[in-house]
Amino acid sequence: MTSMSIIDDENVKKTSNGAAVVTDVAQHAVSDSDNNKAQLLGDGSNTEYVVDIFIEAAKDGDLKVVKDVVESGAVDINNDRIDELSGLHWACINNRFSVAKFLLLRGANPNQAAGPGGATALHWAARYGNIYIVDLLLKHGADPTLKDEQGLNIMHFSVYSSNILLVVYVLYFVVNNNDNVDIDSKDNNNRTPLLWAAYQGDFLTVELLLKFGSTVAWTDNRGFNALHCALVGGDQRVICDLILSGANFYERNNQKQDCFDLAEGMGTKSLFEQALQHHGYDRLGNQKDKLFKKSSHAQFTIFLSPFLLMVYIYLISLVLSPVLAIMLSLLVTVVMVNTLKKFVLPCLPRKNTYKVSLTRTPFFSGLFLSTFCFLIYIWTKKLYPYSVSDYTMKNVQFLVTSFLTVVLFLRLVRSDPGCLKTDDSLTSIQETIKQLIDLGKFDRENFCVETLERKPLRSKYSFFSGALVARYDHYCPWIYNDVGLKNHKLFVFFAVTVQYHMFLFMWLCLAYFKKTNYIYEQVEEYARCALLKNETLCKGSNYDPSTFFLFIWISVNFIWLGAMLIVQFFQILKGITTPELFILIKEEHKAKFINLIPFENSIYTSESKGVEDSDMIPEGPSATTITHTISIDGLEPRNRRRAILSACFSMMGINQWLVTIKEIVGITHILHGQVPQQHHSSLLRSFLVTNHWKTNLTDFWLNSDVTAPLWQRFFYSSDTSKAMLGGTEVDYYELYEYPAREGEVLRPN
């Protein structure tokens, strides 16, 4: 903990005294008359009293009182407190931009050290993550090379704030431009910013520092390296990042403890062992031989494994009873999945993510294709011969949908979802940050810390693609790709085709089962089923278990895909994407059950054009970094169970489906504008969900090329970044505010 922590956090928050009280006192204490001014300046007790008023006003951001006091000459803004924090310090701590700017323009010294740690206003602003204040101070001559009594500089304090955006700012505007501020700056204990970030468990900061070239091998006075600190902090992603960067497992600290000893003592042994396993090491830190030298071979093996599983299930269904075949199939599936996780996944690269899961591999696309191939095999060998004479058209439709399924699947796997190209040059990144700061929009909603570029509206960073995806909807493991602006319509065509294809297969299966019933008409024991009450299904399970098992598997997928299509069509009708629906659900849930009002910052809603206008600067501690989080540990046991259950539902997509059904039948009105008043500030709600359903359908199904024939606009997706939104053509790669509807002017985002 730094020396700044000596001051209690309550002392740096907004005081409980109302601004009106301070203003009233100031109006009596500070007068424009020369007599009163002389009286105040001549009386030491009165001067101290006015200084107290000045400090309280600086804390509260009461610019009027601050101006009155300063212009009266009652205080010296560079000597307004002795051995304590000045008005400028308090304004910087509490993120009072207008007050800080006024004091700096009046000649306040930004490099004055104050407080028990001898920190400057820049140090305090960085400590509390106040980006706009830091930018203001640097523009008014604050020296970023200064250190406090503990040897901490702006780089340490920005990391200590846990504000990744401030770390980005300092790296690109201070470290890059000043040779005296090093990314591996050391405090009096020889701790670098990377050691601090690892100890705090800030994986975003650690990743950024490593990307910027921070030294992993550096140790502090206690002999702790970055991996030691990460094991104390207990964040697995940080541990994984440092292992990937070559951290030494066996290096010992001053207490002769290596990483294994430290993990044992800190209770992070399991996290450390999992991280080692994720990156191809055994529990002792020895590099394990990889089963595949090339990651492409590992991916191909994962893709083929479902085919082997399907062949196995088919073969055992021919020789074993249905119950035993199901049990063995489940057992082999579990063994296969665990084998892939243990031996094959470690062979894959960790691009854009700290560990690889099976859903981010070709496994599910292989499962889809193997199911499709098995389905075609059963149709060719069994269903077609029995049904071609009676159901010719159904078989023709099945053949056509089979062809379309293959074509659409291959196109989707290779399609571009709408990834934005990144300009990672230093000049481009600095210009983007500077532009966002001037607009008052340098926040996580408008800036992507993974790609270091401005985020267009409705875009989202994809760890799978490693890029921002325009109008991002979701990642689909079945097509091994993201779904976004350029392939969303193609994905819906694919899903509808697959759904109808499965329907035809199930229909032909039932016809096949009925037609083969005559074989067992005289053998009653074969028609006895303990679970199946339907005679057709019962006889089908006894006569042809392999076809019956495939029928059940297809039926399950038919139900699941049908529910997904209901959600997709509902979202298309409302003009929103899956992440946007989740945002609205989360917003509604928090307001209803946890009594949280969504944070509203005037910096995002003001029509002013820049941060120079003091009225649009966020006033309040860390106003630029406030986020809403829910701690499960802090909830009542009943609410904790509900939160865990809700998380599981979200992962399975059940929440999404339930909300859709409730909206359709009118039980809830999340998307109809009938919500508490505090939600109406949401631009997402005010624009997207209030568009007419016909407009939303047109936006999705027709591309923006109005010169093309209607059928072509419907069936073809645009290869460019342009599409319709609210009936207006927009460029989704540069969409930074929603287009205004006719007769309406919307606030910029």
Curated annotation (Swiss-Prot):
Gene3D superfamilies, per database record: Ankyrin repeat-containing domain (1.25.40.20)
Question: What ranges are annotated Extracellular (topological domains)?
Answer: 382-392, 511-546
The record lists the membrane-crossing segments as 307-327, 328-348, 361-381, 393-413, 490-510, 547-567
Q: Which organism is it from?
A: Saccharomyces cerevisiae (strain ATCC 204508 / S288c) (Baker's yeast)
Q: What is its main location?
A: membrane
Keyword Transmembrane among UniProt keywords: yes
Q: Where are the ANK repeats?
A: 49-79, 83-112, 117-146, 150-183, 189-218, 222-251
Q: Enumerate the SMART domains for this protein.
A: ANK (SM00248)
**What is written about domains in the entry's comments?**
The DHHC domain is required for palmitoyltransferase activity.
Q: Which residues lie on this side of the membrane: Cytoplasmic?
A: 1-306, 349-360, 414-489, 568-749
Question: In the UniProt entry, which residues are flagged as the active site?
Answer: 476
Q: PROSITE patterns per the record? A: ANK_REP_REGION, ANK_REPEAT, DHHC
Name the membrane topology term. Multi-pass membrane protein
Of the GO CC terms on this record, one is: fungal-type vacuole membrane
Into which EC class is this enzyme placed?
Answer: transferase
Name the family the entry cites.
Belongs to the DHHC palmitoyltransferase family. AKR/ZDHHC17 subfamily.
Protein name per UniProt: Probable palmitoyltransferase AKR2
Give the DHHC domain ranges: 446-496
